[in-house]
Amino acid sequence: MSSNNPRVFAMVAGEISGDILGAGLIKALQKQYPDAKFVGIGGPRMEALGFESIFSYEELAVMGIVEVLSRLPRLLKVRATLIDELVKTQPDCFIGIDAPDFNIGLELKLKNRGIKTVHYVSPSVWAWRPKRIFKIAKATDMVLSLLPFEKAFYDEYQVPCTFVGHTLADDIELESDKAQARELLGLDKEAEYLAILPGSRGGELKMLAEPFVKAASLIKLRYPDIKFVTPLVNQKRRDQFEQALREHAPDLEIHLIEGHSREVMAAADCILLASGTATLEAMLVKRPMVVAYRVSPITYRIAKGMMLTKRYSLPNLLADDDVVEELIQADCTPEKIAAAVATQLDNDFTPMYDRFMQMHKGLRCDASARAADAVIKLVEDNV
């Protein structure tokens, strides 16, 4: 592509967290390339910046091995169409944002056709399926990692990797304001709140809404004055959660809010949440938390056989320590969840707070700017 033509960047982001990262990267790249074009699969935040989506990013929001298999024909068709479109477009660079099972195969095909490729957000090769690093080495010109310990892993295998920090650590203030968050959301200024976050995907709510609302009922028995608040990403997830409430806790009152998950966490005294990126946000707003997760039994058996780490949540992985309680699969029961939340409500939070603050500072690196700088260097290098 001639240097006189506007740069073209192709991206694929598969869920909300990827949409946030993609939007930050687009903003940073637009400072260097104001006329750049951005195409691929992105979410609403990316599209608000002019990103042109070829498919809806909901296409990629699939959890679990069994669940992916049921959608595999459609996912393969989406990927094949994308490859055809991007080979015609010949972007200056393709950036796959997370969604490794979809993006790494796509990156390999594009790299073999002469397109520079970047994978933004390292897959958890240090935790499970470590042999993926050899495919990553073939598929990408560079990995952009969010977590500091990941670069050392890639360096060991001589795979180009740049640690950029995490955009969430940049966006979230070191001290979050509980009173301000409650005012924004219209919550009681004095009440004790438990935030309940059962995930953003339909599959997550299918597995977690029931144990979470049953646990909330048990917590209400022990703490009669406690209040509950739950953010849900859209009307579909709200309908799902309300159905679970009707079936499993019809008398329980939970304040439901569309979006604003970060503000809900900041407003809370304690957080019960699904394992995932939200655990990092909970750590960054510095609230005590309990992490719980379960998937289909078949998915769990397959995944467990490939795991290299016994920890799941990002705070525990970052700390290399059991900082927050994790209740996974068989332990994800209403009784165990309620007991773990009670422990957090009753105990001194100071030691956990201090660990959270230390980790927050370590991730605060102006990640979008660093990621953009690495992409720009790759694009401008014509060797």
Swiss-Prot record:
It catalyses: a lipid X + a UDP-2-N,3-O-bis[(3R)-3-hydroxyacyl]-alpha-D-glucosamine = a lipid A disaccharide + UDP + H(+). InterPro entries: Glyco_trans_19. It comes from the Bacteria. GO terms for cellular component: membrane. It is an enzyme of class 2 (transferase). Keywords: Glycosyltransferase, Lipid A biosynthesis, Lipid biosynthesis, Lipid metabolism, Transferase. Pathway: Bacterial outer membrane biogenesis; LPS lipid A biosynthesis. Coiled coil: none annotated. Its EC number is 2.4.1.182. One of its GO terms (molecular function) is phospholipid binding. Condensation of UDP-2,3-diacylglucosamine and 2,3-diacylglucosamine-1-phosphate to form lipid A disaccharide, a precursor of lipid A, a phosphorylated glycolipid that anchors the lipopolysaccharide to the outer membrane of the cell. Belongs to the LpxB family. This is Lipid-A-disaccharide synthase. It comes from Shewanella pealeana (strain ATCC 700345 / ANG-SQ1). The gene is lpxB.
